[in-house]
From Swiss-Prot:
It comes from Beutenbergia cavernae (strain ATCC BAA-8 / DSM 12333 / CCUG 43141 / JCM 11478 / NBRC 16432 / NCIMB 13614 / HKI 0122). Together with its co-chaperonin GroES, plays an essential role in assisting protein folding. The GroEL-GroES system forms a nano-cage that allows encapsulation of the non-native substrate proteins and provides a physical environment optimized to promote and accelerate protein folding. It is found in: Cytoplasm. NCBIfam families: GroEL, PRK00013.1, PRK12849.1, PRK12850.1, PRK12851.1. Disulfide bonds: none annotated. GO terms for molecular function: ATP binding; ATP-dependent protein folding chaperone; isomerase activity; unfolded protein binding. This is Chaperonin GroEL. Its EC number is 5.6.1.7. Belongs to the chaperonin (HSP60) family. GO terms for biological process: protein refolding. PROSITE patterns: CHAPERONINS_CPN60. Its main location: cytoplasm. InterPro entries: Chaperonin_Cpn60_CS (IPR018370), Cpn60/GroEL (IPR001844), Cpn60/GroEL/TCP-1 (IPR002423), GroEL-like_apical_dom_sf (IPR027409), GROEL-like_equatorial_sf (IPR027413), TCP-1-like_intermed_sf (IPR027410).
Length: 542
């Protein structure tokens, strides 16, 4: 395919136009008085949202250089969202301000490499000042306030704070769509996985269609079980002990499954057979998690354990196991707390070292099942469009709340950046074009507060100057128009969100400033309509 090439100012300005198209669409959503953006979908109803990353993802520009600029800024929004769950609009606004100021200086003759170095040093200093300002999140109310601001709804904030309080910061909070209006929180104690009983004959509670086994043994097998001969010695020992048995294996089929069902129906002993969750290595890892949680062992040929030789010592135990047709919950496993802590530490290390988002998500789920618990927030709404938008807002607010617990909070509303900058630039010493790079950051960090003020119908520059003169933590409450102590008023942002937004914006701005040439695909000309006529009815003269 033929390429088009642009150099120097033409290349940079083309990219900047793309950035501006995207940023101008996104920044109208910033702050408590930000507006919504309607996104047309090829299929189904349009989406209405005020989430920066959702808007950015939908924007596809036609002009090649503009498209490249927009794609780079999408990366800022996506990366900030992945890390902190919020701050995508702030990151986009910061990137726009940094690029605008930077390109002005490059056009005036500044050295782009020195500018980038100055920007990086200034961002490092502002980040350090932000972390110094951070206040640890200690109360449920503070978490509720942070999540409530992210979701734009205090009720959602309170529900997320309740969920985090129950499952802990390692716990998993999932968001599901509900048929009922409103919000509902469902908590799961113990480990839950998405596999149910292999036969409805195992059900003990007919009304709820559940198999509930109290104080039961748990047999964990890595392979399939089809022959009853392998299982009989162990079954006899379990029956003598007078306990019920849960078997979790790759599969249980044929005469082995039939024997368990017949014994259950005769009342000889209670049991339930469940397929192990996951596939391949992930299944092995989850079986090992269950073994540590319940104090048992995984019966596997690879470690020299066979089913026919297994003893009661190889079985795990739990106070209660609830199995439905779709899922299994193990409550209060009898595992050794030290071994459990070791396993949790191991999974945490794997999360740190993983490069794949998918693997990280799955490891996080395993960690939650072992260390915390699972909370499900069920969200309902009157229309499908509203439901999708609400679900997305709640998911972002959950990540936002976890970020607040992780690194602490700072004053919200764009105030923390300005006040951290004031502290950072007092001691920062730069020379030449690096100093100009530092000044670019100094100007750009005002942009989020100015945009929040503009969206609230106020004069951005006036508000920024006023906030600069206020005590630390005091700023504009854009919802009311008052200047007050924002942390006391519950207007805060996780420092991780603010920090990530600034760092990611600066990273992309550096790429813009140091770009000297662009090579892009030449747009294809639209082909003429079929039939070669006048484009109406194929030239048929109608």
């Amino acid at each position: 395919m033929a390429k088009i090439i642009a150099f120097e100012e033409e290349a940079r300005r083309g990219m900047e136009r793309g950035l501006n198209h995207l940023a101008d669409a996104v920044k109208v959503t910033l702050g408590p008085k930000g507006r919504n953006v309607v996104l047309e979908k090829k299929w189904g109803a349009p989406t209405i949202t005020n989430d920066g990353v959702s808007i950015a993802k939908e924007i596809e520009l036609e002009e090649p250089f503009e498209k490249i600029g927009a794609e780079l800024v999408k990366e800022v929004a996506k990366k900030t969202d992945d890390v902190a769950g919020d701050g995508t609009t702030t990151a986009t606004v910061l990137a726009q301000a940094l690029v605008r100021e930077g390109l002005r200086n490059v056009a005036a003759g500044a050295n782009p490499i020195a500018l980038k170095k100055g920007i990086d040093k200034a961002v490092e200093a502002v980040t350090a000042a932000l972390l110094e300002q951070a206040k640890e999140v200690e109360t449920k109310e503070e978490i509720a306030a942070t999540a409530g601001i992210s979701a734009g709804d205090p009720a959602i904030g309170e529900l997320i704070a309740e969920a985090l309080d129950k499952v802990g910061k390692e716990g998993v909070i999932t968001v599901e769509e509900s048929n009922a209006l409103g919000l509902e929180l469902e908590l799961t104690e113990g480990m839950r996985f998405d596999k149910g009983y292999l036969s409805a004959y195992f059900v003990t509670d007919q009304e709820r269609q559940e198999a509930v086994l109290e104080d039961a043994y748990i047999l964990l097998v890595e392979s399939k079980i089809s022959s009853v001969k392998d299982l009989l010695p162990l079954l006899e020992k379990v029956i003598q002990g007078g306990k019920s048995l849960v078997i979790i294996a790759e599969d249980i089929e044929g005469e082995a499954l039939a024997t368990l069902v017949v014994n259950k129906l005769k009342g000889t002993f209670k049991s339930v057979a469940v397929k192990a969750p996951g596939f391949g290595d992930r299944r092995k890892a989850m079986l090992q998690d269950m073994a540590i949680l319940t104090g048992g062992q995984v019966i596997s040929e690879t470690v020299g354990l066979s089913l026919e030789n297994a003893d009661l010592d190889a079985l795990g135990q739990a106070r209660k196991i609830v199995v439905t047709k779709d899922e299994t919950t193990i409550v209060e496993g009898a595992g050794d707390p030290d071994q459990l802590a070791g396993r949790v530490a191991q999974i945490r290390a794997e999360i740190e070292n993983s490069d794949s988002d998918y693997d990280r998500e799955k490891l996080q789920e395993r960690l939650a099942k072992l260390a915390g618990g699972v909370a499900v927030i069920k969200a309902g709404a009157a229309t499908e469009v509203e439901l999708k938008e609400r679900k997305h807002r709640i998911e972002d607010a959950v990540r936002n709340a976890k970020a607040a617990v992780e690194e602490g909070i700072v004053a919200g509303g764009g105030v923390a950046l300005i006040q951290a900058g004031k502290v950072a630039f007092e001691t920062l010493e730069l020379v030449g074009d690096e100093s100009t790079g530092g000044n670019i950051v100094k100007v750009a960090i005002d942009a989020p507060l100015k945009q929040i003020a503009i969206n609230a119908g106020l004069e951005g520059g006036v508000v920024a100057e006023k906030v600069r003169s206020l005590p630390a933590g005091h700023g504009l409450n854009a919802a009311t128009g008052d200047y007050e102590d924002l942390l006391a008023a519950g207007i805060n942002d996780p420092v991780k969100v603010t920090r990530s937004a600034l760092q990611n914006a600066a990273s992309i701005a550096g790429l813009f400033l140091t770009t000297e040439a662009i090579v892009a695909d030449k747009p294809e000309k639209a082909s003429a309509p079929a039939g070669g006529g006048d484009g109406d009815m194929g030239g048929m003269g109608f």
